[in-house]
């Protein structure tokens, strides 16, 4: 284990860091990089998790539960306390104690910005698809001989991790727009996947939400580039607003959307993968792009990653090879397993657009098999999002053959009167069952499925735990 007095390449403020909520996807990635760069890390979280266990194995000191004494785990005490204000209340006893002691309290984005300093920075933002597109970009660069540092919101299939301190000069990361913290960064290359209304509980209006993307684009380094998916109306409008700004804008999308730098000409589902025909402005002839993940939206994400990788100097053939081998990201249409002819996938989709995209991919998988039904187990995420998008969720989920709706996963929110999973279930036109008792879900779903059916558990909460339970129940009923 690292000891006090050792050498690091970290700024003084980040050499001994205590992290409140260390097990989360974003926080655990920061902890990994700090440890890799020679820092000392302690932390706390509300419960054990894969992230907590992995960080302990790398030398982090971690407690379950929150107590002021947690700040004494590092010899000499922490030089900074890091948290994410979206999940941790200011009344947290460790944050209160840090302020009492005069220890700087930093938010995760500010720390990530410090870690990216001195690198060529490539970032992906947008309402949906950030984690997958960022991961595709990382893999494309790795297959081109780069060793980028990276921080991403999910575990890469190939790397098995959500963060890495690389030996190269580039750093790839997501830029989360949900709380405006992406304005901490000064990137060189930015990919914008899409822009549509979300996180209105924080921004208050669609206009304020949209504006943060304009402001972020204004922070791109002179000589850098903005890569935009013009299939999406919100992202296309951003590109149009910036057309006379002097910023170089690269556009990608489908045919019929104007002169593009990368065009998706054709796309064909092949099992749980796909093959696409694409055209690049720099190439005389169409090219074949193969993917190991399903869904037309994934092909568009891959085009954005391809353009960004090429901007960073990556070889085209190597990029295409990397994209062909991309295994996906944990909880992004991830195969959990199969039992008695029933396949179960898990997906993070928690916005109507994401639900539609995932169901399109699910439907293609079912149609390719030639039999079976598409079944969704959906858990609404946040009361505010549920009440805002109930009808849109209902319309999106109605593309399934059967839907099971769980109660709302509250996360950081307090309940809203009259809002529950039934609010969404009532808007679904397909056969639907509302299941407020989480413990009864696996058995109820297993009783409904038949060989050939494909089930996807969907949402940003603990619905992810149900996939294996459903498979176990299916096996038990054989």
Swiss-Prot record:
Q: Which GO terms describe its cellular component?
A: cytoplasm
**Compartments in which it is found:** Cytoplasm
What sort of enzyme, by top EC class, is this?
ligase
Tell me, what is one Gene Ontology molecular-function annotation carried by this entry? ATP binding
Query: What S-S linkages are listed for this chain?
Result: none
Which residue spans traverse the membrane? Answer: none
Q: Which UniProt keywords apply?
A: ATP-binding, Cell cycle, Cell division, Cell shape, Cell wall biogenesis/degradation, Cytoplasm, Ligase, Nucleotide-binding, Peptidoglycan synthesis
Superkingdom classification of source: Bacteria
Q: Which reactions does this protein catalyse?
A: UDP-N-acetyl-alpha-D-muramate + L-alanine + ATP = UDP-N-acetyl-alpha-D-muramoyl-L-alanine + ADP + phosphate + H(+)
The family classification in the record reads: Belongs to the MurCDEF family.
Annotated PANTHER family: UDP-N-ACETYLMURAMATE--L-ALANINE LIGASE, UDP-N-ACETYLMURAMATE--L-ALANINE LIGASE-RELATED
Q: What is this protein called?
A: UDP-N-acetylmuramate--L-alanine ligase
Q: Which gene carries the instructions for this protein?
A: murC
